[in-house]
Amino acid sequence: MTYKLSTKKLSSCAPPHKTRELGANHSFLYIQSAIMRYQKFQPVSELKPFVECYFIWEGKAHSGLQVQSPPNAFCSMVFNYGDPYTASQNNAPPMEVPKAFLSGQFTANYTLELKGMIAVAGIVLKPCTVHNMFGSRMSELVNSRAALSFFPGLPVDILWSAVKNETADEGKIKILEQLIISYLPAIKSNISIIDEAVEYIDTCKGCISVEAVAEKLNISRRYLEKKFLEKVGVSPKFYARIKRFGALSNKIAHQEKIDWQEIVLEFDFHDQSHLVKEFMEFNQMNPSQYHLLHRELTRFVK
C-alpha cells in the first residue's frame, strides 16, 4: 500500500515529518510531501508457526524522517539496502543500525531516524524462532539489533546482495522465505513447552497470569520463568503485558466509539487509570489520543 498524507491536516495529532507504528499490525505514514510504501506478505502455511509476516518498506525521506514504534512481542530479521539509518531508545544517543541484523524483544518505544533512500526488507519472527534457529540466549538480544554476521551459518553478504539486487517484491520475499525454510529442521527440533506457553499467552491476548500458564502446562513457575528468559528474552509476565497492550491497541484502533469501562473489564485492568498508565508505558500517547489519531489517519490513507 502507498500512503500520501499531509501533516497540515494532522497537526493536532502529530508533529510533522514523523510516523508512528500503531500496534503490532498497523503502520501509517504521515509525512508532508512524501510517498512511502510499507507492504506485508503472509508466509506459506508451513512457516506460519514460526513467521508472522515478511515486509518491504521503501520510499524517500530527503528532509529526514522519524519513526516511533512501541513493543510488539515479535523479533525480526532485517536487510537495509537503502541509506544508513539510526535507532535510539530511552533517551540514549542514536546508533547506526547494521545493514543486516536480528532484533529481539523490545521493552519500550524506540525511534528510527532515516534520511535519503529508504529500502528495507525483513521477516517478522515469532518470539521463539530466533532461539530455535540459532540457540541464542534471547535475554542478550533484548532492546538490541545484532549484526547477522554474529550468527553462525549465515552467508550475510550473499543474502544482502541478493535482496538488494532483486527488483521484484516477490523475488525479495522468496529469498527470505528460502532462508527460513533452510532452518526448518533446526527450528522444529528445538520446539519445547515454552513455545506452547507463548502460544497460550497469545491465545489469551496476554490476559493471563504466570501461575495459570504454568498450571495449564503442568510445569513449575520457576521453570517457566527460567526457560522463558532463554527462549523469548523477557519474563512471561512482561511478555503477557506486551501482548495485552497489542490486543488493546488493536481494539481501540478499530472501534468508532469506545466504552472504556467495557475495555477495562475485557482486558482485566483494575480501573481506567490503570489502563492509561499501562498503555502509556508502551506508547507515547494515551488511549484516547491513540484512538483519535487512528480515526484521523484512516480518513486520509489511500
Label the predicted regions:
Residues 2-3, 7, 11-13, 18-195, ...:
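Alpha-helical bundle regulatory/interaction domains
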Residues 206, 241-244:
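Amphipathic alpha-helical protein-protein interaction surfaces
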